[in-house]
Design a protein with these regions (language model features):
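Retroelement reverse transcriptase polymerase core
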Residues: 1-249
């Protein structure tokens, strides 16, 4: 994934603790590089459209791209920009690293290009890919075979431990979908219940973003969310007041 470098610049390496004490993740801080990188405006597919298409399927199989962004190669003339120092040596990335401003969009475009030939039976959201079939089991096997053939031809690899095959209902992009039905993922709902009370406008906006993910399951969502939406108004101080009205919403 990396090679030795003689670049005229290098970004610093930082260590980040993983959640639940699962160790340390070593990352490169590309803050300076990102500052001078033009933004990539590649949009993500609308989740509601994905749910609508995949949710009608009789059979669904999910696939996870192994190592995510690392599957995308960096053109040789740009690799020097990714240089970093570690253990008194300098290295640069051969494959796309995490942390670069354009890594996510580059990966999304690559996945879409790969799946273009099987777009009639596949959907993707970042590194999650679904093969969905409306019809009998044999047709789903045929759809999976077509999917795996284009993945193999692309050179991309899959994380087998995170793949699930031939289910009539499964979790995908925060929802449980299949056989024409859908509902909120219970694990996602539980994680929202465990969130701390927001203290600033920014935290309220983040909370509303999470709640909005499930607005289709809440009758009169806008009415219920209004006390929180009001906290984002210009006349409300940055340190937001939180009372019974907000808690009950």
């Amino acid at each position: 994934f990396i090679t030795e470098s003689n670049s005229a610049m290098a970004s610093p390496v930082v260590a980040v603790l993983k959640p639940q004490g699962r160790g340390v993740r070593v990352c490169v801080n590309y803050q300076y590089v990102n500052k001078y990188t033009l933004p990539d405006q590649t949009p993500l597919t609308d989740i509601s459209e994905i749910i609508q298409r995949v949710g009608q399927a009789n059979f669904i199989s999910l696939f996870d791209a192994k190592s995510g962004y690392h599957q995308c190669m960096i053109v040789p003339e740009d690799r020097w920009k990714t240089a970093f120092c570690c253990d008194a040596e300098m290295y640069e990335w051969v494959r796309c690293p995490f942390g670069l401003r354009g890594s996510g969009c580059t990966f999304v475009r690559a996945i879409r290009k790969i799946l273009h030939k099987v777009r009639d039976c596949t959907e993707s959201y970042v590194d999650d890919m679904a093969v969905h079939t409306v019809g009998p089991w044999q047709k789903h096997l045929s759809d999976m075979r077509r999917f795996l053939e284009v993945i193999k031809a692309s050179g991309f690899t899959l994380n087998l431990s995170k793949c699930t095959f031939g289910q009539s209902e499964m979790k995908f992009v925060g929802h449980v979908i299949g056989s024409g039905k859908r509902r909120a993922d219970p694990d996602k709902v539980d994680s929202i219940k465990a969130l701390r009370v927001p203290e600033t406008k920014k935290q309220v906006r983040q909370l509303l973003g999470l709640f909005g993910h499930f607005r289709d399951y809440i009758v009169n969502y806008a009415l219920h969310a209004k006390p929180l939406t009001d906290l984002t108004g210009k006349r409300v101080p940055n340190r937001v007041p939180w009372g019974e009205r907000e808690q009950n919403s």
